[in-house]
Design a protein with these regions (language model features):
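PLP-dependent amino-acid enzyme catalytic core
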Residues: 1-433
């Protein structure tokens, strides 16, 4: 499969080039030349298949031409060493729990898959010393760092905004050591992302170092996220609830919903999507006005969605041929304040004894507000509520149980290097490696 850039000014790339480069030479995002529809018999029998079997079929459609079947199967099965259960919260609304992986967030799927795929390519080429740069507002850093931990020939640099990441999130990537280095940037998530993008565009840096990205701009990070949309449908089908499925995705950088939209293009029977925003409602405003107006991000209690210029919007636009009408026909938007998010967490805990994290709360509320009669709603519960301990405990007025996996991270010692948001300083640091 070949990949083209959303900006249409860069040469066509192979899967390996797209994964290793991360970003195209014209600063665009890579897109596969074609999206294969999966046969009807797959959908007819999907409820009889395991998560790994479903994921392998989806992965084969994207990556089968480039990776030997046995290798791909091993990558998929290794990646998905945990379940993603669909849990009923209230009448016709289900939570797709994406927090059962090693770092208790949805990004474990993309992070683990990408680490294994990149590891395969590096081994194949006999390469050494590949540097992965990743900007994080919280969960990406931990998922990518833990996915790549101990992978030979790769060193990961996690850039995160000082004081803007919860202690639990921070501990998940600052305590690992080995081939993981945490850089504490004096700025916002957007500043961290700008440093990473500038590094890729810098000719001198790229002559000295082999650089790649693990943000959702990388095709190996966001495409595997399609796996769990198919698995959600399989679980709905088992429950006899697969007709008129509506999927709501709490949205920040838009990699997650883009993967779902790819699933729909492959024939996945989802009636429509809802993108739930916090106060960073850039996409919501686009749906209303047809104009995309990025602006600086605002800090909210759903911090992983505090993105003022979502990278993957370019992919959504490309997928629908730039048509606002086509996009708004399949995706609607909602936007919620911190107050509304708090209210939702509190009421859902009180009424259904189901504990939401602030991001999942946006998803659940959007379905409560927007589900029509005869529809079944699925929202993506993207991280375990204990990852936002102070916020969630403050809302419900009770102690939240911390899962054993998280407790292990909390015991580690934080090690990070301070970094300014000035690219010249970051470049100097990288050149000295």
């Amino acid at each position: 499969m070949k990949y083209y850039s959303t900006n249409k000014q860069a040469p066509i790339a192979s899967l390996q080039e797209a994964v290793v480069k991360g970003l195209a030479a014209d600063k665009g995002l890579f897109m596969p030349m074609s999206i294969k529809s999966l046969p009807q018999e797959f959908y007819d029998t999907i409820d009889t298949l395991s998560f790994q079997e479903i994921a392998y079929r989806v992965a084969d459609a994207f990556f089968g031409e480039d990776i030997p079947a046995e290798t791909l199967k091993q990558i998929v099965y290794d990646t998905l060493s945990f379940d993603v259960p669909l849990v009923k919260v209230s009448e016709n609304i289900y939570s797709l729990e994406l927090f059962h992986g090693p770092t208790l967030a949805f990004k474990d799927v993309g992070g683990r898959f990408m680490a294994r795929l990149l590891g395969y390519f590096i081994k194949k080429e006999g390469q050494k010393n590949v540097n992965v740069l990743v900007a994080t507002s919280g969960d990406t850093g931990s998922a990518v760092a833990n996915g790549f931990l101990g992978v030979e020939g790769i060193h990961v640099y996690v850039l995160y905004p000082k004081g803007k990441v919860s202690e639990i999130q921070e501990k998940q990537f600052t305590t690992l050591g080995q081939n993981i280095t945490a850089l504490e940037v004096d700025g916002t998530f957007d500043d961290c992302q700008a440093l990473v993008k500038s590094a890729f565009m810098d000719k001198e840096l790229n002559e000295h170092l082999s650089l790649t990205s693990a943000n959702s701009i990388n095709v190996a990070r966001f495409l595997p996220q399609a796996f769990y949309y198919f698995y959600a449908y399989a679980q709905l089908k088992r429950a006899g609830k697969a007709d008129n499925a509506v999927v709501c995705v709490p949205s920040g950088n838009f990699g997650n919903i883009t993967a779902g939209l790819f699933g729909k293009k492959m024939g996945l029977p989802v009636k429509r999507f809802i993108a739930a925003n916090n106060r960073n409602d850039i996409f919501y405003q686009y749906l209303q006005t047809g104009k995309y107006s990025p602006r600086p991000s605002i800090a909210t209690i759903a911090n992983a969605m505090d993105v003022g210029d979502p990278s993957n919007f370019a992919r959504v636009l490309d997928l629908y041929g730039g048509s606002h009408a086509a996009i708004s026909a399949e995706i609607s938007g909602t936007t919620y304040t911190d107050e509304q998010i708090r209210e939702t967490v509190k009421e859902t805990w009180k009424d259904h004894h189901y504990l939401l994290d602030p991001h999942g709360a946006c998803g659940y509320r959007a379905l409560m507000d927007g589900l029509q009669s005869g529809e079944t709603g699925v929202f993506l519960e993207t991280a375990h509520p204990a990852k936002f301990l102070e916020t969630v405990e403050g809302i419900i007025g009770e102690a939240v149980e911390i899962p054993a996996k998280l407790q292990e991270f909390m015991k580690g010692e934080k090690k990070s290097l301070p970094m300014s948001k000035d690219f010249a300083d970051f470049k100097k640091y990288l050149l000295a490696l």
